[in-house]
């Protein structure tokens, strides 16, 4: 489907969970001849990341309202109005055929600006519980899609766009069937790390001994303390890194993942075809729990919520999974994934632009 001459504005910001799926769709449409610009905020990760992908970015000033004091709430309508005016001016100059909202604070004023100019608004919700911005925008959107069932009652479930290198991994049977030796446990706390996993996993390693080998992504500033914790637990042989640049290579190495359950992490693990032990971040709406639940229901993962998390709970779970069980879980994870999510979202963007 050629998009020659068509213009898209992607509205996404704040976290990798919003930005990376937006980039996947942007690249897919750019390969079809679309022009793409981005709407973001200057102080969040999109400001650096998006230009590195060859996409021009425009900025508006907006931030979240959750947890802010009474003065901030009183000033909020004016701030939202100013952000809407900025977004509207940007869109009048760029003249997109369609806008794609992937979440983050920037999507709110951006979506309202597009709607006020008669530009179709397409939304994608990455999480199992809809964010506040997308709940509002769903009322005016041309098309609403969701990665997991349940965020919106009637929205189409299309999965989360994930990185091409993850989708290109060999199937679980090819990767895992002949493996022997210690079970390879990949521990991922997200780019910020997860303190609870940094504290728990060295003790888990001590309990499991030679039956596992661990690659632990500690997050920024924690590598030394986590390495020390493994050493003090008598387990200095395990690998600790601050970041993992090549997640596809890490997934290819792993037999099982112990991690948080951010939307993109869950979708990548399913696409890679890996069993997982999820420890959802304790958010008041249990967003990460709902992200992980479909894989637990599919028999591909287990969820241990943070209040129930203990060294014994993790060690007993990992010890109870044989290699045969892990392979079965990996195949179920892959079967539950939606590998063409990027294409599905891109097709809806194209459809909205032609309508």
Curated annotation (Swiss-Prot):
Name the positions where UDP-N-acetyl-alpha-D-glucosamine binds: 15-17, 127, 163, 191, 244, 263-268, 288
Q: Does the keyword Plastid apply?
A: no
Instruction: Kindly tell me the pathway this chain contributes to.
Output: Cell wall biogenesis; peptidoglycan biosynthesis
Q: Principal localization?
A: membrane
Judging by the UniProt lineage, the source's domain of life is Bacteria
An example of a GO molecular function for this protein is:
UDP-N-acetyl-D-glucosamine:N-acetylmuramoyl-L-alanyl-D-glutamyl-meso-2,6-diaminopimelyl-D-alanyl-D-alanine-diphosphoundecaprenol 4-beta-N-acetylglucosaminlytransferase activity
| InterPro entries, per the entry | GlcNAc_MurG (IPR006009), Glyco_trans_28_C (IPR007235), GlycoTrans_28_N (IPR004276)
UniProt keywords, alphabetically: Cell cycle, Cell division, Cell inner membrane, Cell membrane, Cell shape, Cell wall biogenesis/degradation, Glycosyltransferase, Membrane, Peptidoglycan synthesis, Transferase
Q: GO biological process: what's one of them?
A: regulation of cell shape
Instruction: Please report the record's description of how this protein sits within the membrane.
Output: Peripheral membrane protein
- Kindly report, in one word, the top-level EC class recorded for this enzyme: transferase
Catalytic function, reaction form: di-trans,octa-cis-undecaprenyl diphospho-N-acetyl-alpha-D-muramoyl-L-alanyl-D-glutamyl-meso-2,6-diaminopimeloyl-D-alanyl-D-alanine + UDP-N-acetyl-alpha-D-glucosamine = di-trans,octa-cis-undecaprenyl diphospho-[N-acetyl-alpha-D-glucosaminyl-(1->4)]-N-acetyl-alpha-D-muramoyl-L-alanyl-D-glutamyl-meso-2,6-diaminopimeloyl-D-alanyl-D-alanine + UDP + H(+)
Q: Where in the cell is it found?
A: Cell inner membrane
In the Enzyme Commission scheme, what number(s) does this protein have?
A: 2.4.1.227
Q: Name one GO cellular component term.
A: plasma membrane
Q: Which Gene3D superfamilies match?
A: Glycogen Phosphorylase B
Relate the protein's function as given in its record.
Cell wall formation. Catalyzes the transfer of a GlcNAc subunit on undecaprenyl-pyrophosphoryl-MurNAc-pentapeptide (lipid intermediate I) to form undecaprenyl-pyrophosphoryl-MurNAc-(pentapeptide)GlcNAc (lipid intermediate II).
Stated family = Belongs to the glycosyltransferase 28 family. MurG subfamily.
Identification of the protein by name: UDP-N-acetylglucosamine--N-acetylmuramyl-(pentapeptide) pyrophosphoryl-undecaprenol N-acetylglucosamine transferase
Species, as recorded? Shigella boydii serotype 18 (strain CDC 3083-94 / BS512)
Gene name in the database record: murG
